[in-house]
């Protein structure tokens, strides 16, 4: 009888210890992205010889997207640049986050909404740089995870 009483007293403690041991806590993560910008990725494509690159990291705890980018060979000064989404490759979408590309290289950061983060993480964001000759975008690249 005493053994059974001790077992009843210890069982909740053992169960709690097991829950604590085997629980998987959610850890913050920093995820890297890269986009190679080129005219052939624009929709529709154009004949510009310009190229560029954007690298970015997304911190899941702070919801902050931080990026660095560069471009060269544009037909004229960059007038605008943006992250766009949600869109699969070959499709266009609205502006998700503006970029200030007054000169190359450029860098900045922004906090994302949960919906924006979900689209980014699902590979449905792209970057493009606009010029006077190509107001819809001269170069573009899809953000790819893990680059």
Residue ranges and their predicted role:
Residues 2-15:
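Bacterial N-terminal signal peptides that target proteins for export
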Residues 2-4, 24-81, 85-147:
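Metal-centered catalytic cores of metalloenzymes
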Residues 15-16, 26:
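Cleavable N-terminal signal peptides
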